Amino acid sequence: MTKSIYILILLLCSSFISAQSDYWQQHVEYKINAQLDTSTHIIKAECGIQYFNNSPDTLDRIYFHLWANAFSNKTSSFADQAIKMGMTDYYFADDGELGGYQEITVALSSEEGELQLIYLDDQKEIAHVPIKGGVPPGEEICLIFYYELKIPNYFARLGKSNNLYNMVAWYPKPAVYDRNGWHTFPYLSMGEFYSEFANYEVTLSAPKGNTIAHSGYETKQYTNNDYQYKETRLENAHDYAWFASPDFIIEEEKVTLNNNQIVHVKIYRKPDDTIWPEAMLYTKQVLIYMADYMGDYPYSTLSIVQGEDSGLVGAMEYPSIKIIKNVRASDALEYYIAHEVGHAWFYAAIGSNERDESYFDEGLTSFLEQKYIAHYHEGDNYQNNKLPSFLLGSDKPILRHFTEGQICRHLHQPLTTPVAELSTINYGLNAYQIGSTLIAHTESLLGFNKVREILRSFYTEWKFKHPIYKDLLSHIERESKINLSGYNDILAGHAVDASISKVAGGTITITNKGKSEIMMPLLITYEDGTTERENVNPSQQDLILEKYKNIKSAILDPDQTSLDINPENNRYPRPGIGIRIFTGFDSPGKKDIYLSPLIGYNSYDGIMLGLSMYNSTFPAKNLKWNITPFYGFDSGQLVGQSWISYDTKFKSDKIRKIQYRLGIKSFSIANNEDANIQLRYIRIDPCITLHHYHNSASKLYSKTSLRQLWTGTDISYLEMDRFTQNITRLTHNRYNFDKLQPNELEVELEYNQYHAGSFLDSQDYLKLSLDYRHGFLFGKHRKLDIRLFAAKFLMNSQRQSSSYNNLLAQGSIALLNQGFTDYSYNDYYFDRQGQSKRAYRQIGYHGGGFKDALGSANGRIGQSNDFAMAINLKTHLPFGQAKLPLKLFFDAGYARTKSFSADPLKGEVFYSGGVMIEIGDGLFAFHLPLIVSQKISDIYKSESRNLLSKITFSMDLHRWNPWELADDYIF
């Protein structure tokens, strides 16, 4: 038996040694001479590349990245991604703001004549150089590139911003060739790089008066005519960046680390900044802390550069130099410095493939940054410090809440998803939050010292190499003897949901309700006051633990690092009820109920004071409810609304979830002050909604709902009669959140059966309507919105008698919408009967979407008992300040109807145009019609309306429903 164990150990060791000995990577030596012309914004350069083939293969070509060409046109992958991220600066840039290689040739250093540079496609970001005879294993080849590069305006990393030149991705780089072949990919803003380790000799020149910050260390500096020169070196790095500006001053200091390593630190900043003088202190603190945690800093220099505000990237790491945007808060500066300096270990020295595994370097670096912040700020979390304490609920980082919310809503994408296919939110959560949380969870399992020891040994083993994430997990398992197979479940996108399902005496049962079998810490408190902490691995079968003492309480995942989507069931006893105000992230130790005092108003209830009570904010729960009673001081009535909903979620490529909802609301609708009688309505609406699945990166969202509405409206002050409706609505909504051309479609089929007590026998109709909206972005922050609407009665028992919308005949198609046309009580109106001079100018955007308010006395104008259609236009001004909320609008509509049952159908055209002020994309708006059709004009004249009395307003609270936004926001 003992001999067998020895043999097994020998086999394992030999396998590990063999795997290490099989590892190889290519090597590059660069010799670059570059000159910056600030008058033309052009770099002229020679780039010598000595490429060492350490692979077992003969290479007949070498692939190169020419990433600066991403800024040469507006059809590049970078341009497409910028739009998907909601950034339009590059799309609307002038041709003169673009850049890229103007000229580029390549030759062998040992021969005259040019070599071919064959581009992979028209984008010219990826090219290969055919090598005659190839480069055999163990051999090398020397190439020289001659090029002129026009520097674009600053959009992402590379470019000119004010006086600052950001010189990154500025030279041809060989693509990585490893055991999986060539790794070629286009330049992206969201998604970084993978390059060969190299040594650099770089000579930089810029006009006198500019200060040059650069990777590596300086070997010589001199001036010649109007230019200054710097000769620099950098070893064991996979990139080289530099920055030039006449605005920099330099602070420098030699910092001795605790291991006696000396690092030359430089801060390049603007002289008049009030925050950046603290940068040196923060940099020294971070450098010393992280070197203590991880081991030797990999270079002899460290430079921090103050950047500008523009562009898509807030801060970027390069070997031995970091650039940080012009932050305006001290804690933000410290946070950015901590993160970017942390990249010296994970990114600069550990050269993982950032395009395939962004969560590797960003996750480990975020973990280091969090350790630093916690050390220097007594456990503070930078994310949470940005919010008031009443919102937090716990010390769990807010981005971890967002991560769990994405997973709960089945909008999360697996970490194995290629970066180019990720949505913006999922990229950020995958790379920074999940990546760091996995290591934090490892620390929760193993403890601070053990994880520090493991990361240090991993750094030593893989320094200046290209590991993959699997290498890290294997290293942790080997050094800790724990099973991390559950981490692969998380990488694949499986949800974590473990539960303490039963505790009886000293027996505890743990059930795995999710699909991820991740190991978790379990903290037990016994009835005698003692505690025990152990690691458990919930599997698909119940895990039953027998303890020797009675259990008082137990917490699974006490540090909240497992990404468990249902932390409430991680505790015994189950959480009690906690009362909180307004909103916030749920507390894991309590079932939170939120309270929000509210104030409201309508013409019949008067000023209303209310209290909203609800159980869910973010992340949204499956079971959600809201109770919001109001007291109306004018009516003396208790009014308000409530709803409850439940979500059933699916891991499907067809349906994301099904939501079941029941709502009820009731408010006053009229009053008789003399008789002291109030009329009110009540609405009850059960609904089932299918939320269809769309890839999270697609910007698409759609749902189909079946809603049954019952409304009852008092119509007699004698309280003897009530108007009732039974409305069935089948509605399909489709949204496309594209930045350049957002659009949405609603198709609805509505059947309504209604009657009015003794006044009217039961009547019914069937109506089909279509609402399509399309936006066209025609400049930075300038958009033209077009809306098309059409509706037709397919069947109608009463409209054949020419009845229009009133208490006895519902559902007219209205080109002009106000409270009295909102027959199903969908929206919020201050005055539904058009009787209050203060509130009757409120209009709605449903139906024809006209911006005029004619009042209930003119209710027949623009209504149809047969067919109607409309077009609504609104646009920013093509000149002036684009961010001003001032817009132009124009509405045109056609309504076909008949005045008497015997009359033929007759169509009529209406139009109205003017100016409007819109806030929050339709949340609130004020409209002033200036040009109107004859019939509308006649009413204005008959009522002697002046310009101010034509002003109308609208509010669309449904569009900004906080519960729907929290549940169904799309990024």
Please name every model-derived segment.
Residues 74-88, 148-200, 253-255, 562-589:
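Glycine/proline-rich low-complexity spacer/linker segments in large multi-domain proteins
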Residues 356, 362-437:
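Acidic/His/Gly-enriched intrinsically disordered linker/tail segments
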